[in-house]
């Protein structure tokens, strides 16, 4: 969607402002690139109106004590147990459908994750608070 693409273009063009705050793995690589989501109330509940209305934050996973520089926002996502699926066209709807069939409730907003090493995208469906 155009709005998300604009957010990512903006985040990527200013990444140098937060690169030093990014969480790193043992090899010094960035741990994760996230499209974090929340409901409008910012309580990290699922998007409303058939998953069409909510907030989206394009960014990088940062060290816990990071303070967002000017122009950036820090979200601290609650801890959940997730169902994780590789992100392909139609996977969101397919996974929600399968969860409904299996009686599994979505307890928070779904997040986009991009593995910086492989470039593969994943969807994280929160199913239980931890």
Roles of regions detected by a PLM:
Residues 1-130:
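A solvent-exposed interaction/effector surface
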């Amino acid at each position: 969607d155009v709005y998300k693409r604009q957010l990512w273009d903006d985040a990527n063009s200013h990444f140098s402002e937060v690169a030093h705050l990014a969480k790193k793995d043992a090899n010094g690589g960035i741990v994760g690139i996230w499209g974090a989501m929340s409901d409008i109330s910012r309580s990290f509940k699922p998007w409303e109106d058939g998953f069409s209305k909510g907030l989206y934050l394009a960014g990088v996973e940062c060290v816990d004590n990071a303070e967002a520089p000017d122009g950036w926002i820090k979200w601290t996502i609650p801890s959940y147990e997730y169902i994780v699926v590789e992100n392909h066209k139609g996977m969101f709807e397919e996974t929600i459908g399968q969860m409904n069939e299996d009686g599994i409730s979505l307890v928070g907003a779904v997040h986009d994750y991009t593995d910086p090493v492989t470039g593969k995208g994943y969807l994280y469906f929160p199913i239980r608070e931890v």
